[in-house]
Amino acid sequence: MKKLRVLLAIMLLTLGAESYAREQVINVKAGDANSLRKAIEKANLQNADSLSERVFILIPDGLYDLGEDVNTPITGHNISLIGQSMGGTIIRNAPPVEKEGIQTTSTIRNLASGTFLQDLTLQNALNYYAAGSAGRGVCYQDKGTRSILNRVRMLSYQDTYYTDNVLGQSYLLNSEIHGTVDFICGAGDAYFDHCTIVTERRTLNGSGPVVIAAPRTADTNWGYVFEGCSIYSRLSKFSYARGWHTHPRCVFLNTTLMVPELLYANRYDPAGMRTVNSDFFEYHTMDARGKDITPKSNVVTFTLKDEQNPVETIITASQAKRYQLKIIFPDWRPEKKLAQMAREAERLKRIHWGKR
């Protein structure tokens, strides 16, 4: 009897260990937006604690049409939204034009830490060209921190990707962001690693300037760092960035310009919205053939009413080295976390969807 009790105890411990180690996986029905909503709601409830075990929401290829719903929230921590493919898994909403706004339109609103998105498209289908002077339609509003996006496409026009946390940290790898005006905007530190940036037409006929980024860096040291990104341009001329307010920071390193003639001569917009204190820099810009087309000097005088702030925006190789990922996020190392989660996501895909 004693041996039986010991055996039962061992079995219970083993079962408990297996139960603890088992991945938390929520499957979404293909193309079913309501199924996606319920999956996110379930994950939010069970991962309310910041130390919660990571949960993976598996989203098969299909269109998940949220209709006019806005600000679908992620409030649970350590939640992964894993699509089947970047081009095939599409989460879309279409806010009415009268709801236009940076706080009132997002497809997904993240309020948690440790959120991971991979292999999907977020599309905000607000009718930008019918919206008048402003057509703000956010795809991913990040009020949380330590978000990682891997192979995520964001389709919109104005304010497409909004980092809405002054202390937020974000890392994007091999992702694609489309837009026209300030379509990468906000606060905190965000590192764009070999991403594709697509500037769309500012107006239907292509007239009017395009601005990629509008940082409002306040309480962090780095702002927006673009490393090894490619910029594709659709007809309208564009600037890298303009200052929003506070102390904007932005740097483009090792950038490939597919249509360099569409970049304004100033490269950065000198007209600040609410500040002239812009730390905007550039290093080793190339054309589509890999030729270095960086000017030797580019002094931009940032201006706001009677204030002026001249800045040499071209930096040296030694200055560029300070923007290494390990320096920017020394206690996070998101590239290592991404590699680990991506491997797990691929394993789960094979289990649930078969060989790819």
Write out the residue ranges for each language-model feature.
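Sec/Tat signal peptide C-region and signal peptidase I cleavage site
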Residues: 17-21
